[in-house]
């Protein structure tokens, strides 16, 4: 049996995750946001650029799933997610903090609009990615790409801060 969710509940989860991450980010100085070491050589800024790069894919992925197709593979020339993440880090590490922060905010608004445009029925329809044998409801992918991703990186930042 497929686990379902009400659209309003998913939107609340997404907005709550966003607010929690933003609250954490707002509590940090520019120096804290740009100092390496959060996870390996990544700074808070690098984590934010990483989240943004993956989040930017979500609207197109949602449209693919709704159309009944698995989304195109992101950067298929790389064999592992770690290789993709390293590539993204190298692409964004020299971007200025204000640019990364603005890109994150814009990306979130686009992702939220994409989620808002999906019907509750579609959110609860099983879908799968290209390399997966099992399917899950669309809302689970959205939850993972936004809520769980924010939580994962927020926790890394908190551990680094010692809080």
Model-derived segments and spans:
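Surface-exposed helix-capping loop/turn segments at secondary-structure junctions
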Residues: 26-33, 116-124, 163
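Short, flexible active-site loop motifs that bind/organize anionic cofactors or intermediates
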Residues: 23, 37, 90, 113, ...
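Acidic/histidine-rich alpha-helical segments that form the ligand environment
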Residues: 13, 83-124
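Extreme N-terminal tail/first-helix region
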Residues: 1-20
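Hydrophobic alpha-helical core bundles mediating ligand binding, dimerization, or RNAP-core interactions
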Residues: 14, 18-21, 25, 58, ...
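Short, contiguous alpha-helical
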Residues: 34-83, 124-163
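A short, mixed-charge helix-start or loop-turn motif at secondary-structure junctions
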Residues: 3-7, 90-94, 135-139
